[in-house]
Regions:
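Conserved beta-strand-loop-beta-strand hairpin that lines the nucleotide-binding pocket
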Residues: 1-8, 53-143
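Generic, well-ordered alpha-helical segments
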Residues: 17, 38-46, 61, 69, ...
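Conserved polar catalytic motif of the HATPase_c/GHKL fold
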Residues: 48-52
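Generic hydrophobic-segment detector
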Residues: 11, 23, 35, 39, ...
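STAS-typified acidic loop motif
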Residues: 8-19
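Conserved short strand/loop->alpha-helix "switch" segment adjacent to the catalytic nucleotide/phosphoryl-transfer site
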Residues: 23-47, 106
Length: 143
């Protein structure tokens, strides 16, 4: 698929980098002139994806999170968040609302939020090999 512009970031799975990641994506997406609602949805989806990497992919040690964004034709923002952490054993169960392996302080709504805020959402994972979240958002053309 052809793209008009792209960025790739790599950063350690520190909680302080979650805000950096969502802000970087919001700044990158701004070239598409999104509405405030679209920008908020994108920031939230990226926040959930990166937080999952920080909390679940690397529970015992720091690891690397890779974030790739591309501008595709027809005003589509393509986002990939990837880790090489512990992976997900049962993707179907993990995608169910309210399911979490993170304890009582976790809501278990991350994948549900990502799926509802983005136009498309795909999840690929294998135990011991990491997880890739691939999301796209088709943005309105503002007049």
């Amino acid at each position: 698929m052809k793209f008009n512009n792209y960025m790739i970031l790599e950063f350690p799975s520190k909680s302080c980098n979650e805000a950096f990641a969502r802000s970087a994506v919001a700044c990158f997406a701004s070239q598409l002139d999104p509405t405030l609602e679209e920008l908020g949805d994108i920031r939230t989806a990226v926040s959930e994806a990166v937080t999952n990497c920080i909390v679940h992919a690397y529970p015992e040690e720091l690891g690397i999170i890779t974030l790739r964004c591309r501008i595709l034709k027809d005003n589509v923002l393509d986002i990939v968040v990837k880790d090489k952490g512990v992976g997900i054993e049962d993707i179907e169960t993990a995608r169910k609302p309210m399911f979490t392996t993170g304890g009582a302080d976790r809501s278990g709504m991350g994948f549900t939020i990502m799926e509802s805020f983005m136009t498309t959402f795909h999840l690929i994972s294998a135990p011991g090999k990491g997880t890739t979240v691939h999301m796209r958002r088709k943005l309105q053309r503002r007049k």
